[in-house]
């Protein structure tokens, strides 16, 4: 406990920090109502990814008062749906001071500890399939979403444990941080900074196509939400909410082209070994 207190105090600073939370764009599995996996993006997910890149370039990377560039950080998980969502974000170099120190904007950092809750034997299933094949597990999860652990998988409590060192690292930053992540993981980060009870965190609203801006203050946390993409008629047939009510065939995707393009992407050189 003493060590954790010392670590916390060493990360405290007086500067107001801003954290931006974004779910990945709609994935192929979102469209099919499946959980887990490592699928690519649907066409709607790709549209959001492009819009996120524009938002970072035009808004997030600039000081709101002066319009001058401000240094920003970028985190993703190691799963391709977050990496593909962030790949349109530019990485220009900016000058930090008169001494010529440079900063690479949104230098991508890929973190396995940011990966979505692992669903174990239920990975790749819809909730209807889980209820049909594992009715007891389905009931247990409904009774205790926070503590329930998927067979051979994880629980929300497990994810809290692996997020702990990253939360402390976030506390130490003074630059804005954009986290492109997953619903379950972002729920817990959101709950931490807003002071939400962790039991309620399991159902916190982290919608697709939206950036949530959090500014932690002394006794509260300011929050704003900006919807970057509204589904259009061309998205008909796509499950815009990313839930498990989708039907029909697989949404058209851009995954193959994106995978080919990603070999020259800086993300490919910035992975970390698993720690759970």
Residue ranges and their predicted role:
Residues 183-187:
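GST superfamily/GST-like fold recognition
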């Amino acid at each position: 406990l003493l060590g954790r207190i010392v670590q916390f105090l060493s990360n405290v600073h007086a500067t107001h920090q801003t954290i931006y939370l974004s779910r990945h764009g709609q994935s192929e599995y979102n469209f099919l109502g499946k959980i887990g996996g490592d699928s690519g993006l649907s066409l709607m997910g790709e549209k959001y990814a492009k819009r996120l890149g524009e938002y970072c370039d035009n808004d997030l990377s600039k000081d709101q008062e002066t319009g001058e560039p401000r240094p920003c950080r970028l985190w993703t998980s190691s799963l391709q749906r977050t990496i593909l969502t962030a790949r349109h974000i530019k990485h220009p170099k900016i000058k930090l001071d008169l001494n010529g120190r440079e900063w690479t904007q949104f230098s991508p950092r890929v973190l396995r500890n940011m990966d979505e809750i692992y669903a174990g034997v239920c990975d790749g299933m819809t909730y209807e399939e889980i209820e049909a094949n594992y009715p007891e597990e389905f009931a247990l999860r409904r009774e205790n979403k926070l503590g329930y652990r998927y067979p051979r998988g994880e629980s929300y409590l497990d994810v809290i444990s692996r997020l702990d060192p990253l939360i402390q690292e976030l506390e130490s930053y003074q630059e804005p941080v954009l986290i492109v992540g997953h619903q379950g993981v972002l729920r817990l980060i959101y709950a931490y900074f807003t002071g939400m009870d962790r039991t309620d965190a399991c159902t916190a609203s982290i919608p697709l196509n939206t950036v949530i801006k959090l500014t932690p203050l002394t006794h509260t946390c300011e929050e704003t939400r900006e919807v970057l993409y509204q589904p259009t008629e061309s998205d008909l047939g796509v499950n815009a909410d990313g839930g498990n009510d989708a039907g029909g065939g697989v949404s058209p995707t851009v995954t193959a082209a994106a995978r080919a393009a990603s070999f020259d992407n800086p993300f490919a050189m910035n992975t970390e070994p698993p720690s759970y």
